[in-house]
Amino acid sequence: MRKPPRRTRERILETSLALMNREGEPHVTTADIADEMNISPGNLYYHFRNKDDIIGELYDAYERTVAPLLATPPAAEVEDLWFLLHLLFERMHEYRFLYRDLDEITSRNRKLAVRVADLLRRLESTVLELSRSLVRNGRMRASERPRLLAADRPPDVRACR
């Protein structure tokens, strides 16, 4: 039985993700993506108006993979926290260009900058709540003030300032 062919739009997203992770978002153009896929730039533009639209869809996909992890109930064991952190870091690695090129991407797209800042706050909140749960259950010890100094301010996303 033959596999059904992947749709062009999905292939554009997969190729874009791979290129941006490998080369860095600022170094990838829509022409590079089309060349990598052996399609015409017009075919790419049929599916996406510009590179920022592609980035927006990639961010949507990233957010969908992370959202269920943020809804995780408080951990009962330290291993649960480590597992959650492992899953979060796997997702971050899969979409690593978003973090590596965060300033560049968010400086061009205010709406995305706001969404990124919100997600970073939710990530921080989830990890802090899981840590507090472990402290309450006696599974982990923490100082009076378990937050990192860097966590005392909102995520540093230039476009949100």
Report the location of each language-model feature.
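N-terminal intrinsically disordered/low-complexity leader segments
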Residues: M1-R7
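Helix-turn-helix
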Residues: R11, T15, L19-D53, E57
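Short helix-capping/turn signature of helix-turn-helix
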Residues: F48, E104-R108
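Hydrophobic alpha-helical connector segments
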Residues: E57, L70-L98, S107, L112-V114, ...
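Short, basic, alpha-helical segments at the C-terminal edge of helix-turn-helix-like DNA-binding modules
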Residues: D60-V66
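Short, hydrophobic secondary-structure boundary micro-motifs
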Residues: R100-L102, R115, A142-E144
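Amphipathic alpha-helical packing segments from all-alpha helical-bundle domains
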Residues: K111-N137, R147-R161
